[in-house]
Amino acid sequence: MSAMPTDRTDQTMFARIPKLKSAVLGFVWVLLAAPLLIGWYVHAAATSSANAEAAYDLQPVINSENVPPLVMLVMSRDEQLYNKAYSDYTDLHEGEAGDPGVIDATYDDTFTYAGYFDSNLCYSYNSGSTSYNSASLGVQTGTGLFKADNAATGTNSHYCTSEWSGNFLNWLTMSRLDIVRRVLYGGLRSIDSATQTVLERASIPNDLHAWVKVYGGSDVASLTPFSYDASNPVSFCNASIYSGSGVPSTAPLMRVVRGNYSEWSATQDSQCNWHDTDGDSNNPSMSSGLGSKEYTVRVDVCDETGTLARESFCRQYTNTTTGVSTYKPAGLLQQYGEGGKMRFGLMTGSYADPRTGGRLRRNIGLFAGNGSDPTTCTTGDEVKLSDGTFCNQGAGVEGIVNTISRLKLVGWQSTTDGSSSGWKGD
């Protein structure tokens, strides 16, 4: 059973996600990722001179150098944000020259898939690495993470040798909510310190929000550590296993097995289970899993040592007191908010106030730098400018990052009809 829906969204919203080539395209990307409405509010001081006023009116108000644009993000809390980002029933190349006009029903190496992995890097997986911090926002325990090793090769710079392609991992693992988080502020961090950053996929209930992707392309050995078998593709099932109390009891998982298990996420009850767990003969046994069998979908990004490959979406921060530089995954909020070029706020729906237009989660204001000391977090700061770590992430604290990072589906249990499902928080 699936969690009860709220607002409806277009099923194809996330099927085509363009590259960030400019600020405008970046905001369009966010609009495609989720039902966000961006309101632009610009005010300017009037002058007493009629001639000056006439000259002022000759150019758009947005061009004023003295008044930053004020942006209010209005975001729906829709359960469809937890669906897969890449639906595999859309023409990804629609409108491009030479487009054959057919549906791209599987991975397409000529397309760059956005997500927490750099599409042009190769990743290894370490099953024993610590990938969470107990102080992070509601993350679950569990070890294992991906880490970039080197640059990818091939015609499209997406191929690897005995490793995971970042482009392929984005296609496999990303949900719609992950794309929203990635575009806005770099992604959900399960570790956020001055020396390490680990991003993790959204918590996906193992109801019908879970998804499986089956890939049998002859280049599978260039995209994964697994060999090609013409008669046996590889199935990848994505979910977080929910407990009897209706909350996730595991870290975000990707389970991998040899064979075509296209209905692994379409069973009568809970999804992405091993046969050993539920006794369903249609599900694969854990012993037949490939590699680590279960992969925690967390990735250690923005290598601080400088010895390994570093993702292209990492932003450099320098502590002016110590001279130490750190790197953090960043999005549009950091790009336009940290220097005060734009001011941001956020409103979302609320179950506590369902008929009053939702709640103001963050009033429009400076995203960072509200105090005089960049090495400390001041009220209103969402990023510490000296090292890029997030600020003010406590429960009930206003903030765009804090609010969106805390969104989570809870209440679903495979033993109920799903009537108690809903959103975490108010």
Regions found by a protein language model. Name each.
Residues 26-40:
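Bacterial N-terminal signal peptides
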Residues 1-24:
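N-terminal secretory signal peptides that target proteins for export/translocation
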Residues 44-426:
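Divalent-cation-coordinating short motifs within acidic/hydroxyl- or histidine-rich contexts, strongest
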Residues 19, 30-31, 158:
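Alpha-helical interaction segments
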Residues 2-5, 38, 52:
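A subset of signal/propeptide-processing and intrinsically disordered low-complexity segments
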